[in-house]
Amino acid sequence: MEVVLKPILQNIVRKHGYKIFFQKKFSVVESLKGRVPASLANRKTDFIIASNKKFVNIEVNYYAGPGSKPEEIVDSYINRKKELEANGWSFIWITDGNVWKTSKNQLIKAFNELECIFNLEFVRRGLLSEALLRILA
């Protein structure tokens, strides 16, 4: 799914003058004077978008079928969001796939805890771009 989103994010970044980091460790933003939680510094992220010392972690996942992974990811991303927000970051999760038709409780849990969750259709309609404009303004 990163392959699908990378060109979309590159267009948003180019249009608004943001910086993008793809498949980098969180510590990459230390060069931009960003605060990085110690527990995340050496972890890789799908995307980081940066502008004016504001940072957004974007994680993307596609799940074709049921399993324990989507449940673990929801809990993990809720915890990550809290840790990032404590350090001045924002968090966006882009997820899609048939698993969410049968894992509605986990999806509801995610919507109750995470402000920015999008599927591919929402991204294509421009909601990700709007969210980034609001967050990075």
Where are the regions that the model predicts?
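Catalytic cores of nucleic-acid endonucleases
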Residues: Y62-N105
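Domain-level recognition of nuclease-like catalytic cores that cleave nucleotide substrates
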Residues: I94-A137
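Acidic-basic catalytic patches of nuclease active cores, encompassing PD-(D/E)XK
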Residues: M1-K33
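Hydrophobic, Leu/Ile/Phe/Ala-enriched alpha-helical segments that form helix-helix packing faces
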Residues: L5-V13, R80-E85, L136
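Active-site metal-binding core of divalent-cation-utilizing nuclease and nuclease-like domains
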Residues: F21-N52
